């Protein structure tokens, strides 16, 4: 039953999160950019927090498909993938003032930093996180959860590109042409190159501290 319920939770989050994202242009006209961002964040968190609680409570449910936690090297690989996932995820934290609506939320179309590697870093981050935790936990519940999360983020790639194209019909096609969904593909094609100084930002220190803290808490 928990396998079905986690998919229901994920579907509910998808409807709230992606649904409100799709309604952003109309919502901002009525509530303003800050007001709608607060509504968006509050509604998303209202579903995400109990979803995470349900996941942690049931992550070992179902059939134990494999048990590799005691295999030498597995722990290091799992933590390596987890740390890498945060490096892809954290561009969303560059503008915390906007996320919390302290500053006026704005749209940022750019092809620097992690965007040179992948246009949708959050999808890559979630996929890496799912792979790492599926390897570590090894339960049928974790497999179902990971497949659901990855499927939602793949939908998010399509949905996000569609929204950007509709909102920025002139600027987005150029960004899309010069970046890639598959990590490093635009670099392989010669459309992008890594500029390491773009990664030298104070926020990365915060990510490193966060990863280390989570490691010790685990």
Please place each PLM-identified region on the residue numbering.
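Membrane-interface helix-loop junction between the first two transmembrane segments
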Residues: 18-36
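Structural signal for membrane-spanning alpha-helices in multi-pass inner-membrane proteins
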Residues: 48-55, 89-92, 133, 213-217
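A generic, lipid-embedded transmembrane alpha helix
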Residues: 39-59
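Membrane-interface helix termini and inter-helical loops of multi-pass transporters
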Residues: 24-27, 57-71, 101-103
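Hydrophobic, well-structured mid-protein blocks that either form specific transmembrane helices
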Residues: 84-134
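Alpha-helical transmembrane segments
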Residues: 2-6, 70-88, 141-153
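Membrane-water interface of transmembrane alpha-helices
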Residues: 16-20, 87-101, 161-167
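Hydrophobic transmembrane alpha-helices
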Residues: 5-16, 115, 119-218
């Amino acid at each position: 039953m928990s396998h079905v319920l986690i998919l229901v939770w994920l579907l509910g989050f998808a409807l709230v999160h992606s649904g409100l994202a799709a309604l952003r242009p109309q919502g901002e006209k009525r509530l303003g950019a800050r007001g709608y961002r607060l509504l968006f964040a509050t509604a998303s968190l209202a579903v995400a927090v109990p979803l995470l609680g349900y996941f942690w409570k049931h992550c070992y449910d179902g059939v134990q498909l494999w048990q590799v936690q005691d295999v030498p090297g597995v722990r290091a690989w799992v933590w390596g993938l987890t740390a890498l996932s945060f490096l892809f995820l954290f561009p969303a934290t560059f503008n915390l003032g906007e996320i919390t609506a302290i500053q006026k939320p704005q749209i940022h179309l750019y092809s620097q930093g992690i965007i040179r590697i992948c246009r949708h870093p959050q999808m890559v981050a979630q996929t890496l996180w799912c792979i790492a935790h599926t390897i570590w936990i090894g339960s049928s519940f974790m497999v179902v959860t990971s497949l659901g999360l990855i499927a939602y983020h793949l939908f998010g790639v399509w949905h996000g590109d569609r929204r950007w194209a509709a909102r920025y019909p002139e600027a987005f096609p150029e960004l899309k042409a010069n970046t890639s969904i598959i990590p490093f593909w635009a670099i392989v094609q010669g459309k992008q190159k890594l500029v390491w100084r773009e990664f030298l930002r104070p926020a990365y220190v915060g990510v490193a501290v966060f990863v280390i803290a989570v490691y010790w808490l685990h």
